[in-house]
Amino acid sequence: MDRIIGIDLGTTNSCVSILENGNVKVIENAEGTRTTPSIIAYANDGEILVGQSAKRQAVTNPHNTLYAVKRLIGRKFEEDVVQKDIQMVPYKIVKADNGDAWVEVNGQKMAPPQISAEILKKMKKTAEDYLGEAVTEAVITVPAYFNDSQRQATKDAGRIASVDVKRIINEPTAAALAYGMDKAKGDHTVIVYDLGGGTFDVSVIEIAEVDGEHQFEVLATNGDTFLGGEDFDIRLIDYFVHEFKKESGMNLKGDPLAMQRLKEAAEKAKIELSSSTQTEVNLPYITADATGPKHLVVKISRSKLESLVEDLVQRTIAPCEMALKDAGIDRSKINDVILVGGQTRMPLVQKLVTEFFGKEARKDVNPDEAVAMGAAIQGAVLAGDVKDVLLLDVSPLTLGIEAMGGVMTALIKKTPRFLPRNPSVLTADDNQENAVAIHVLQGERKQAGQNKSLGKFDLAEIPPAPRGVPQIEVTFDIDANGILHVGAKDKATGKQQSIVIKANSGLSEEEIQQMVRDAEVNSEEDRKFEELASARNQGDALVHSTRKMIADAGDKVTAEQKTAVEAALVALEAAIKGDDKAAIEAKVEELSKVSAPIAQKMYAEQAENPEAAAKPAEENAKADDVVDAEFEEVKDHK
């Protein structure tokens, strides 16, 4: 089996890792960092930038620089949380034909999985560069509280990126895997408190050693898929906007460029206030009016930041209480608390966690890397490289069907582990029906209409019978990715029908295939751009070395040779400015050809007279010793 990488596809940052020789390796990207900003930018010339390069140009290209897109994945445009984000991001969130929340870039509508695929491609390339071989398979993590639509959309992103997603696993579970394989000895019950860039999860996980095998059992999970570091940033941005308006009378919210600068400043200030008690935000020329340019200068203390976000931190407590209740465990029985996600570096978060669970959280688990490391371990389990790990996860939300009277009948409760084939019997609502509609739901409400509809299908061609007589057995089966398979069988006739519940808010097969083709086209364009850049670099280097050689040769070059070389130089420089790789290569060859006799002549002369050849080098060394001026510090001794 091919090697399976682990990818943490985060809201703010993403990370990729691999298990090598029994150890998990977090792989550095091309920029030399172990995490990559989950930011994608679409340049006017069609180039797609991902990661740090996208982040660097965000201020000058705010409308086409996308961040925190994971918050939109599997979401409907009309949802309150989406409407809230529309007010805060500089890019355009639009309504797709199927009602999904999509993004518009350069006049083109794009689905969140299509955008997330660009990050996955970057992670895939990072792994391939390190391993020196093609990578096609991955384990990708998602928030534990992601619903079926969001999980399916994440798998779609993998397909668009040409990644075979072997497994979708929950982020807290992945973090526990990393912790359990490295830190835990013996039986442990741990809390994984995961406050990331866009989502919050908490899981109660039991780690046991059974006959030499590490067994990870998720007892319960809870969370909020729209609570994370981005919300903390928004509070800071609002504060800066308010302070600036109070000072200047100007509202920055209608200025996308200013808002992008504020976004970066808020993120930076938040990070600084985790290690210092005060910081200053200084943004010159943030805007201008008739009186001239305006500058934003705001001092903010850690206590002020904490007062701005205290309610957000408090919002994490209710899911913690619910997770403990669902697991049937008292907080005093928790052995360790593991913090995951960059936002957990905030002192207020750590203080609250310590107070609630009555113990200090562990500091020896990297909150930015633990999830990707756990995904890599799961990948190694699937590949057969790790044989002593058993992972038992839970369904994050109750799954059921609509019964008579619009009541939801639960088939799989949210607390137990994934239970395959849990049957329930349904009957017909109306007299003499020859078909029964199966309506699949996800949620915790008793009223069917208040839960999320995952899909509908009909069991047709059953004998007409009075209301309540037909006996339809409905079976739910959750696969290892948390994707739901539903079957229905008429007990009288044996007639069967089954479907895989895919995100009804997700992409159609045709859309996914088109996006895969688009990604392949982009990949080909990227390859051509890389080859063109390489040809340009080769041409530039040859121009530089040839001009230096002509200067060093002096009168040893004939006028005829100099004219020919100069003409070839001009032709190559012109070709470098263009986009024709073949033309550049042809001009490189032409310049190499006309300059070769001069190079050979100079080489021969150097071989005959090495002392003369050394003189220019000595002169250059002397020239290097020349300084523009000398300064001496004179101290006043008193």
Swiss-Prot record:
Extent of Low complexity compositional bias: 605-615
Record-listed Phosphothreonine modification sites: T199
Inducers of expression: By stress conditions e.g. heat shock.
Classification via InterPro entries: ATPase_NBD, Chaperone_DnaK, Heat_shock_70_CS, HSP70_C_sf, HSP70_peptide-bd_sf, Hsp_70_fam
Residue ranges of the region described as Disordered: 605-624
UniProt xrefs under CDD domains: ASKHA_NBD_HSP70_DnaK-like
A molecular function (GO) term: unfolded protein binding
Keyword list, A-Z: ATP-binding, Chaperone, Nucleotide-binding, Phosphoprotein, Stress response
Similarity section: Belongs to the heat shock protein 70 family.
Role played: Acts as a chaperone.
Record HAMAP family: DnaK
PANTHER family in the cross-refs: HEAT SHOCK PROTEIN 70KDA (PTHR19375)
Protein name: Chaperone protein DnaK
